[in-house]
Amino acid sequence: MPRVKRGVTARARHKKVLKLAKGYYGARSRTYRVAVQAVTKAGQYAYRDRRQKKRQFRQLWIARINAASRQNGLSYSRFINGLKKASIEIDRKILADIAVFDKVVFATLVEKAKEALTK
């Protein structure tokens, strides 16, 4: 079995890692050993934050719906309960969008929820 020298493959691997670390601060973008650590950690953060992003957006939507429904005299939980009783199925993303950009429509939704709660 012939001897294998690693020059070409090592260089390619180093280039790949340094390309991924482009734009990082200081030695993280220039030194291979530090760049490997930085790229690995960045990958871990990216993996974790792709999951957290979903949670954070849901929190934001709920906060917006809560603020808008309270302006119309109903708490968030009672508003959602009223919508369920009125059999109005709009998800929180769309509700938050309506609350921000179309206050008249949101006010009518709150009224429908109030009617369903009093029945």
Swiss-Prot record:
Family matches, as Pfam families: Ribosomal_L20 (PF00453)
Lineage of the organism: Bacteria, Pseudomonadati, Pseudomonadota, Gammaproteobacteria, Alteromonadales
The keyword RNA-binding is annotated on this UniProt entry: yes
Family indicated by similarity: Belongs to the bacterial ribosomal protein bL20 family.
Organism this protein belongs to: Shewanella frigidimarina (strain NCIMB 400)
Alphabetized GO MF terms: rRNA binding; structural constituent of ribosome
Entries under InterPro entries matching the protein: Ribosomal_bL20, RIBOSOMAL_L20_CS, Ribosomal_protein_bL20_C
Function: Binds directly to 23S ribosomal RNA and is necessary for the in vitro assembly process of the 50S ribosomal subunit. It is not involved in the protein synthesizing functions of that subunit.
Entry superkingdom: Bacteria
Cited NCBIfam families: rplT_bact
Annotated GO CC locations: ribonucleoprotein complex; ribosome
A GO biological process held by the record: ribosomal large subunit assembly
Keywords annotated in UniProt: Ribonucleoprotein, Ribosomal protein, RNA-binding, rRNA-binding
Gene: rplT
Name this polypeptide is given: Large ribosomal subunit protein bL20
